[in-house]
Amino acid sequence: MSISVMANSHLNQPYASASPTPQEKGRTCRYAGQAVRALPIRVITVGKKRSEGVRLLVDEYKIKLKPYCSFEDSLVRSNPRNAQDVRAQVEDEEVAMMKLIGSDDWVVVLDERGRDIDSEQMAELLGDAGNSGASRISFCIGGAYGHGTQVRKRANVTIRLSSMVLNHQIALVVLMEQLYRSWTILKGQNYHH
């Protein structure tokens, strides 16, 4: 099954950069306290070997996420053929990333040009994905030169974690924390306030 219809029109504008309006700030997630289908989550990151500190934080959040959903962390080697040309490097990384994205995955691309969302909207994103009919959510963190065209086109949603460019290791840690925070929002737990 291929997911070709965008599950949520307010989140699928690939390069919109609108921040939440003042009316949206302080609002609650529309799925809070409701049953949400917990899809397995896969985070696909392009990069090199992770630092010990990042590995420890990722492992900590994997444990925290365990009660909510299954989680898989996949690392795609950056510049696998040591290409000198940036375009060739991005294409090689893209091929490896696309092999990890299933045809029925709900794909979230993290990109500096993506939509700026808050924590409640991230929780809603998880709820929307759970209601989409997809079998898994795949979050894609690109390499030093970003994502290739195929990955961008495959995205159901394109978001950014910050207006600043983040190193892939920092982006991974921020994403992991936000995934945990999102689940606590969905479950009405006290972590988020």
Curated annotation (Swiss-Prot):
GO terms for molecular function: methyltransferase activity. S-adenosyl-L-methionine binds at residues 110, 142, 161-166. Its EC number is 2.1.1.-. InterPro entries: Alpha/beta_knot_MTases, RlmH-like, tRNA_m1G_MTases_N. It holds the Pfam family SPOUT_MTase. GO terms for biological process: methylation; rRNA processing. Belongs to the RNA methyltransferase RlmH family. This is Putative RNA methyltransferase At5g10620. SUPFAM superfamilies: alpha/beta knot. Keywords: Methyltransferase, S-adenosyl-L-methionine, Transferase.
